[in-house]
C-alpha cells in the first residue's frame, strides 16, 4: 500500500501529512527547526520513519514562491527552508510531485482562507487531532496528500469509515 505524503513548507511552520491508499489518516507532524533553520537530518529521519520501504510512497510538495512585500531576509529564509525541505524529500528517492496552492485548493473548492483548510481537514480526519489554530500547516499537508492521492491514484478508492 502506497503512503501518500503531503508537505506544506515553511521556515518555522512547515508540516507533513500522510494518508494510506484509502485516504485514512496515518500521521502528521511539524517539521522541526532551530533558529529558523530546518533540522534536515531530523526531518529526513522522521519522514523515513513513517514510510514502509516495502510499500513505497509518493510525496507532494507545495510549490510556493515568495510573496510581494516580503523583506529580503524573509524571502531568503523562506527560500532556504523550501530548498532544504525539497532536497530532503528528493533524497528519500521516492517520487516527488509539485502542486501550487491554487491548484490543490481549487480541487477541494477552498479559497485562500486557511481556516477553510483547517475545517475541512478536521472533518475528513477527526483522529488527526487538529485542535489548535497552529495546526493549519498539518491540515494543509494532509489536504495536499489527499490531492495527490486523488490525482495520481484516482478517487475510486474511498476513505474507509
Regions found by a protein language model. Give the residues of each.
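Phosphate- and other anionic-substrate recognition elements at nucleic-acid/protein interfaces
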Residues: 1-161
